[in-house]
UniProtKB/Swiss-Prot annotation:
Record-stated family: Belongs to the universal ribosomal protein uL4 family.
One Gene Ontology cellular component annotation held by this UniProt entry: ribosome
SUPFAM superfamilies: Ribosomal protein L4 (SSF52166)
Compositional bias segments (type: Basic residues): 63-76
GO biological process: translation
Subunit structure as annotated in this protein's UniProt entry: Part of the 50S ribosomal subunit.
Function: One of the primary rRNA binding proteins, this protein initially binds near the 5'-end of the 23S rRNA. It is important during the early stages of 50S assembly. It makes multiple contacts with different domains of the 23S rRNA in the assembled 50S subunit and ribosome.
Biological source species: Phytoplasma mali (strain AT)
UniProt xrefs under Pfam families: Ribosomal_L4 (PF00573)
Keywords in alphabetical order: Ribonucleoprotein, Ribosomal protein, RNA-binding, rRNA-binding
Region of interest called Disordered, as start-end residue ranges on this chain: 55-76
Record-given protein name: Large ribosomal subunit protein uL4
UniProt-recorded Gene Ontology molecular function terms: rRNA binding; structural constituent of ribosome
Family matches, as HAMAP family: Ribosomal_uL4_B
Amino acid sequence: MPKYNLINQKGDFLSQIDLDDEIFGISINKQVLYDVVNAQRASMRQGTHATKNRALVSGGGKKPWRQKGTGRARHGTIRSPLWRGGGVAFGPSPRDYSVKVNQKVRRLALKMALSWKINNKNLILIDNINLETHKTKEFQNILDQLNIQQKTLILTKDLNHNLCLSIRNLSKVLLETVSHVSVYQLLSYSTIILTKEAANYFEENLK
């Protein structure tokens, strides 16, 4: 089992704890990570794009002139894509972009992402985050004490009211619960702050 330093919110060393190899120490398969991230990003798309084709554009039910004898090109409707004000040919229509990924693969990718962060020393294991107020300054002091300046993802077991309010004005910080975090989020942020409770949740639920 890999040993990892547990610190408090001031950055002081508390102890070394054993992390489960099956969660935080597995080998990385980039193809699995790519497939899951690709699916998660695709599911973010609304897919509500739409244009009006010749059937949806208002009007055009009557033939503009008779078929023969006028010397003009033959037309059956003024809403043909060839006409000004006509429908769009082969335009986008609403669709569902979601891609099915098996639950086993999603869980595997989540474990790989955590292992990746552990291997690259981009994960900070903290005992707990306690804030007396909801002021941004108080949480910024914690980031300064931990010497964190890059994009940061905070993973907790449950949402904390003061913590939620204190990070709202920090553009580079995101708070997420372990039950809702995605592989895309784990890989998008440079630093992960993981509480001890959140780590225990992963070990209990990702096996």
